[in-house]
Amino acid sequence: DNVTIEHSAIVHGCTIGDNTLIGMGAIVLNGARIGKNCIIGAGALVTQGTDIPDGSLAFGSPAKVIRALTADEIEENHRNAMHYVEIARESLI
């Protein structure tokens, strides 16, 4: 729930936890597991079988965990997802 996958991202055969954002142009490959409350940076490459723990910021190629997200960043992920839900609702009217 509340996952945001930004423009040109590729997600294939992976698991993405709730309230996570996959940045523009990121690639997440088979068997990768992205925990809940994460941000995968724009252009990141999450390789096959990689495990990104809950609450992590990860970027790079290959993607590596840089640090834990702050409470404000986790809340912003949720607000971002809800914004897209609202846009979708408006477009259906």
Regions found by a protein language model. Name each.
Residues 28, 51, 64-68:
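Residue-level preference for alpha-helix termini and adjacent loops
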